Amino acid sequence: MNNSRMSSVSTQKTTGRSALGTKSALAAIIATTMMVSVASAASLQTTKATEAASTGWATQSGGTTGGAKASSSKIYAVKSISEFKAALNGTDSSPKIIQVTGAIDISGGKAYTSFDDQKARSQISIPSNTTIIGIGNKGKFTNGSLVVKGVSNVILRNLYIETPVDVAPHYEEGDGWNAEWDAVVIDSTDHVWVDHVTISDGSFTDDKYTTKNGEKYVQHDGSLDIKRGSDYVTVSNSRFELHDKTILIGHSDNNGSQDAGKLRVTFHNNLFDRVGERTPRVRFGSVHAYNNVYVGDVNHKAYRYQYSFGIGTSGSLLSESNAFTIDNMKKISGRDKECSVVKAFNGKIFSDKGSIINGASYNLNGCGFGFSAYSAKIPYKYSAQTITTSLAGSISSNAGYGKL
């Protein structure tokens, strides 16, 4: 993927040129300089921007601080894609805090015209030691992806991110139309904290899909991908809503050489509202999910609930005190309908402690999937509160952007 960075204005040859050309070049230089200064001239608008991850896997092996050590010259306030790119400054890994004070259209208001065009302009690379935080309820991103790839120590907080719409999905025989582009990608990266972030299909929901060649023209991929040996990730107090294939941890059954022993991820105090599946689906990784709320409907017209926890090849998951409210649940393969919140994809390790399904306790360990109990030690301090319908309501109310 391409790194987006501010490019300086090249020196123009003056031979045979009019004074108008020289003035145009000067104007471009001034405009570029002003753009950088707008991105650079900012005071810290919230002390939340200097906070580090306080629990979960992101606290381990040195912790996750993002841009907490940023100097005053590396604190920015941005409200446009040009300002955002200027603040990121390409691959500059010096600590920085980027405060998002407006709705940022990553496309810059120019519609994508092809796969190549969307790939070139919609994928925004985030460098190491960066905190990106929305101010109030103003921090929004549309028409693109935040790509955290090959870096370390990144924090995303208090943001609304609309899942991108693929303008040129590809067709796979036997599998139909498939889309690219996730809202957030964590790839080959360690130490990431995602907190109070809302990711949603927003204005373009799946019931608006058309058909092409007789099949549904799918234009959404995932909300969040964590893959290729990424490690030490915490996702907290966030809201995932109105989406189908939501969170993937480990992208392939054949990537064990890179993923084994990594992909350690914590999910706590999140709301998954009207999402179809993969919250998460895990391969190779070790996932700890506690005090999360899952709301869905098997008969939903756009986002039919299928399952929450997908246990894939060499993946393991510990569930503690989660709340599932799923309408129109049905028995699958002769098992109790409550067992449908878990799906086995060749995975062998899963345990649940104290979760409730539709307001009542249920033993998910007795569903007959043949899982071994999760026995790995959780190395960080945490507090999984006893889940009740009242607590589930509080978690839901606090989840997502604008609540920090």
From Swiss-Prot:
It comes from the Bacteria. InterPro entries: Pec_lyase (IPR002022), Pectin_lyas_fold (IPR012334), Pectin_lyase_fold/virulence (IPR011050), PEL (IPR045032). It is found in: Secreted. It is an enzyme of class 4 (lyase). Residues 1-41 form the signal peptide. Pfam families: Pectate_lyase_4. GO terms for molecular function: metal ion binding; pectate lyase activity. The active site is at 278. It catalyses: Eliminative cleavage of (1->4)-alpha-D-galacturonan to give oligosaccharides with 4-deoxy-alpha-D-galact-4-enuronosyl groups at their non-reducing ends. GO terms for cellular component: extracellular region. Its EC number is 4.2.2.2. Keywords: Calcium, Lyase, Metal-binding, Secreted, Signal. Its main location: secreted. The keyword Lyase applies. Binds 1 Ca(2+) ion per subunit. SUPFAM superfamilies: Pectin lyase-like. Pathway: Glycan metabolism; pectin degradation; 2-dehydro-3-deoxy-D-gluconate from pectin: step 2/5. The keyword Secreted applies. Ca(2+) binds at residues 182, 225. Its cofactor is Ca(2+). GO terms for biological process: pectin catabolic process. Involved in maceration and soft-rotting of plant tissue. Pectate lyases have been implicated as pathogenicity factors which induce maceration or rotting of plant tissue. PelE is sufficient to induce these effects under laboratory conditions. Belongs to the polysaccharide lyase 1 family. PLBC subfamily. This is Pectate lyase E. It comes from Dickeya chrysanthemi (Pectobacterium chrysanthemi).
